[in-house]
From Swiss-Prot:
Highest taxon, organism lineage: Archaea
InterPro entries reported in the protein's UniProt record: Me_CoM_Rdtase_prot-C
Name of the protein: Methyl-coenzyme M reductase I operon protein C
Record's subunit section: MCR is composed of three subunits: alpha, beta, and gamma. The function of proteins C and D is not known.
Gene expressing this chain: mcrC
One GO BP annotation of this record: methanogenesis
Keywords attached to this entry: Methanogenesis
Length: 198
């Protein structure tokens, strides 16, 4: 094959959803190297894994070995979030934490509600000591995370409550919508930078 790079993907624990099984569902873990892990919330009416599948494909196309993890309990908010108790609770299984720890960089797609984004990121990074790029719809910044104790590359909290650190943010990526090429380019650029490239 000229001009092509082949990736071997050990895919999936569960069947895909949608036409042709193209959309990953909860419990999916597709292993492709140990550089980057793209983490998606559980799919449902509000959480669609489509942008994460597109982001993963774009990163692999840019020759970045990217695995995919779709969380089992990715909907809702963590128990310690201010709005907890009104619906489903967000959480991580020990197996998911171990899968995250096996990768150099996490790329986490967190949706469109500010509180959900910040508190979910805090729970993930409380359990996993890895650099993380947050991808979301709502325009959050490093201060929003630092206010609740999340370590970031730009702003350090007074009392850090996480092991891992947010190294970059890409906002404007909408759940269930096709990810625009300029956003994919931004994600690729920031992932390469976080991995020590140009």
């Amino acid at each position: 094959m000229i001009g092509k790079c082949t990736h071997v993907v050990d895919c999936r624990e569960t069947m895909g959803m949608g036409e042709g099984g193209g959309i990953a569902q909860r419990g999916t873990f597709a292993q492709c190297g140990s550089e980057v892990l793209a983490v998606a919330m559980s799919p449902g009416r509000r959480h669609i894994t489509k942008p994460v599948c597109e982001i993963t494909f774009a990163l692999r196309e840019a020759n970045i070995m990217t695995s995919t993890l779709v969380l089992n309990a990715g909907a809702g908010v963590p128990q310690d979030a201010p709005s907890a108790g009104a619906g489903s609770l967000f959480g991580l299984t020990p197996a998911e934490v171990e899968q995250m720890k096996r990768h150099r960089l996490l790329v986490v797609h967190l949706g469109g509600v500010k509180n959900h984004i910040t508190y979910k990121a805090r729970l993930i990074l409380r359990n996993v000591d890895r650099p993380c790029i947050v991808i979301c719809e709502y325009p959050v910044d490093f201060e929003d995370f630092a206010k609740i104790g999340v370590k970031t590359r730009v702003v350090m909290p007074d009392e850090p409550k996480t092991k891992g650190t947010i190294v970059d943010i890409v906002s404007g990526v909408i759940r269930g919508e096709t990810c625009p090429q300029e956003k994919l380019d931004e994600i690729i650029r920031k992932v390469k930078l976080a991995l020590g490239g140009a």
